[in-house]
Amino acid sequence: MQVDLLGSAQSAHALHLFHQHSPLVHCMTNDVVQTFTANTLLALGASPAMVIETEEASQFAAIASALLINVGTLTQPRAQAMRAAVEQAKSSQTPWTLDPVAVGALDYRRHFCHELLSFKPAAIRGNASEIMALAGIANGGRGVDTTDAAANAIPAAQTLARETGAIVVVTGEVDYVTDGHRAVGIHGGDPLMTKVVGTGCALSAVVAACCALPGDTLENVASACHWMKQAGERAVARSEGLGSFVPHFLDALWQLTQEVQA
């Protein structure tokens, strides 16, 4: 399958839509990244909510623009809440995104994620090892880290997209986004981004938000990858290391939104 490149005009248009619609994103994400995820969404113009109680999660999934399920710090009570939210999201036609953190390394979360696939996610975002494991092609990964190149996971991503109907995102040095029939590659970013906890998880939240936008969902999701890579490049150019990267990254996201509104 041919891999196309995302145009800057497409990315800018999607960011304009993002800011215009300001999606309300229900983030059921892991404990490590909640603040960074919320700030990333806010910097781009979305509205985050971290609702995790089972009864509330189901109720909130019905009114949110989009739902994120991130299994990074999965527990049985949290799985129950996530299951309830996903069931309600399907019933309410709220698009939801799955981030199958470390699914290739741990059996419980792999079985849980496979169970959730029956509720038809709008998008799935993971690294190469996670996507390959979720597709049933291989089990691997070094905990939350990938042991495979993103390009090697393209066939698995295409298979997973066709089987689930989801837009599948494989992140790495180059990000690949596919619906099983089309594929888009997004270059850029910086290796320093992999040294900061939460950049991938935050991207999953932005992907979830983009699934609520009108227009071409594949292009909107690919645009999310582009914004994050652009912001990462700008932040690395301005920072002196990991400690100063995060505030510069959030500034860069905010500045991107201001540029498309100008």
UniProtKB/Swiss-Prot annotation:
It comes from the Bacteria. One of its GO terms (molecular function) is ATP binding. Pathway: Cofactor biosynthesis; thiamine diphosphate biosynthesis; 4-methyl-5-(2-phosphoethyl)-thiazole from 5-(2-hydroxyethyl)-4-methylthiazole: step 1/1. Its cofactor is Mg(2+). ATP binds at R125, T171. It catalyses: 5-(2-hydroxyethyl)-4-methylthiazole + ATP = 4-methyl-5-(2-phosphooxyethyl)-thiazole + ADP + H(+). Pfam families: HK. Substrate binds at M50, G198. Its EC number is 2.7.1.50. InterPro entries: Hyethyz_kinase (IPR000417), Ribokinase-like (IPR029056). Keywords: ATP-binding, Kinase, Magnesium, Metal-binding, Nucleotide-binding, Thiamine biosynthesis, Transferase. GO terms for biological process: thiamine biosynthetic process; thiamine diphosphate biosynthetic process. NCBIfam families: PRK09355.1, thiM. Catalyzes the phosphorylation of the hydroxyl group of 4-methyl-5-beta-hydroxyethylthiazole (THZ). Belongs to the Thz kinase family. This is Hydroxyethylthiazole kinase. The gene is thiM.
